[in-house]
Amino acid sequence: GKYIYSRGCANGKRVQALCGAKNHMIIMPDADMDQAVDAAMGAAYGSAGERCMAISAVLAVGDDTADRFVEQLAPKVRALKIGQFDEPGVEMGPVITAESKARIEGYIDQGEKDGADVVVDGRGLKLQGYEDGFFVGGTLLDRVTPDMSVYRDEIFGPVLSVLRPQSYDEARQLVINHEYGNGTAIFT
């Protein structure tokens, strides 16, 4: 991004380069949970989470909301059909490089060390016939806190972090204060 920005500007071009993103989904206690879960599945795990507008952080307002969200989402993440793009029914393919796979799994390792609950673990995924492929399974982390690298950094992979703010104002402040704010969805 920085290279493209500098080259474009040096050549008199108008350039907008967003060099990092952390998109949030706020889920209020009165949200239609089925709708929020379905939206999270596509937004977090589509394209193996490797797109700039992927949702990578869910701010479920209140513990009851977070519990309901995680309880409904976890089985869907576990059921993701992962494989090569040309296989029938595949919902998620590999990440782009071996380095990306190692980096993503390193973030999951660090999140676990920092105290996040690994509800669904996508590390170490091996698919028959593609044992050396760059596959990372859908990962769901709960009880993530704002100081954890899995929240602070852009992971760019199929990892969804759930935080548990206790009010809309607290959730809103998390979005506002995040270094990589980009897009936010609110379910209410």
Segments (PLM) and residue ranges:
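ALDH superfamily catalytic-core signature
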Residues: G1-T145, S167-D169, Q173-L174
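Conserved glycine-rich beta-strand-loop-beta hairpin in the small C-terminal domain of fold type I
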Residues: V90, G133-V136, D153-V159, H178-N182
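Bilobed periplasmic-binding protein-like "clamshell/Venus-flytrap" ligand-binding domains
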Residues: D114-V120, Y180-T188
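Cytochrome P450 core scaffold surrounding the K-helix E-X-X-R motif
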Residues: D147-R152
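Active-site donor-binding acidic/aromatic loop of nucleotide-activated sugar
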Residues: S161-L163
